């Protein structure tokens, strides 16, 4: 009976969700970097304002990432 309980105990400890992790989980040491991408499709040309707006919307659809800069 003791051998059976020991075998069950060891098998339960072998699962990663039940066993204790030896690594420290200090999140303050991890650095998070955010990337921002500049939208290059839009050109600063006052003559083609409607075309620039279409290009801006097209850029936003391409970018799809809220971290992208340059979308209005």
Curated annotation (Swiss-Prot):
GO cellular component term, pick one: extracellular space
Signal peptide (residue range): 1-19
GO molecular function annotations of the record: toxin activity
Alphabetical keyword list: Disulfide bond, Enterotoxin, Secreted, Signal, Toxin, Transposable element, Virulence
SS bonds (residue pairs): 59-64, 60-68, 63-71
Family membership noted in the UniProt record: Belongs to the heat-stable enterotoxin family.
Location relative to the cell: Secreted
Protein name listed in UniProt: Heat-stable enterotoxin ST-IA/ST-P
InterPro entries: Heat-stable_enterotox_CS (IPR019806), Heat-stable_enterotox_STa (IPR001489)
Record propeptide residues: 20-54
Annotated source species: Escherichia coli
Pfam family, one: Enterotoxin_ST
Function: Toxin which activates the particulate form of guanylate cyclase and increases cyclic GMP levels within the host intestinal epithelial cells.
